[in-house]
Amino acid sequence: MAPTDAEILAAVRAIPRGHVTTYGDLSPGAPRRAGAALAANADPGLPWQRVVRADGSLAKGERQRRLLEAEEVPFRGARVDMRAAWVPAAGASASERA
């Protein structure tokens, strides 16, 4: 079953600074569900920029990149270096799991 909006937004709030997660990690099997929850969100303090596509590409372009760079999220070209990934269920970054 897909997570609720509240569960998705709680997971986004839990993403540590300097890390990212994917839409699919927020809503396994239904990444568009996570996108819809973020689009409907009214909380200006939600760290939406920490949610990226599975391949590390950005949905919100330059604004998202600037915010992530300010958090020292690493990039490889135009994409986030997914070694900065954090999986909500595991609560650990990819580098911590390696």
Model-derived regions: residue spans:
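Nucleic acid-binding interface residues in structured DNA/RNA-binding domains
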Residues: 1-98
